[in-house]
């Protein structure tokens, strides 16, 4: 697992674009899920995370190990950068990038 400390990190910026832009989601064929419940629901439905971003606090959650094992790439981020990936006031500490499934 790698650590990201800069808000200028390319992977972090790419994930943040998925949150902010429908066009980015369509072009990249990916979406960003926030929170353990949404990420675990996606995982249980058969989607595998391409990237998982987790804060130190988020690593304490019981489902963290399962998400990190399933993810292609995993990153630890500080709480200050979690706000960049969140549209909530208090980020839950875990964010996963998934491929948009074909219907």
Could you describe each region identified by the protein language model?
Residues 1-63:
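Boundary-proximal intrinsically disordered activation/regulatory segments immediately upstream
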Residues 102:
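Nucleotide and nucleotide-moiety/phosphate-recognizing core
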């Amino acid at each position: 697992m790698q650590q990201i400390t800069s808000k200028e990190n390319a992977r972090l910026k790419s994930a943040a674009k998925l949150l902010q832009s429908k066009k980015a989601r369509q072009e990249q064929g990916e979406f960003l899920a926030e929170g353990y419940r949404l990420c675990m629901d996606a995982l249980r439905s058969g989607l595998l995370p391409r990237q998982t971003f987790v804060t130190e606090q988020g690593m304490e959650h019981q489902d963290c190990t399962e998400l990190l094992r399933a993810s292609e790439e995993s990153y630890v981020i500080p709480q200050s950068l979690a706000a960049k990936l969140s549209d909530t006031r208090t980020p839950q500490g875990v964010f996963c990038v998934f491929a948009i499934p074909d219907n």
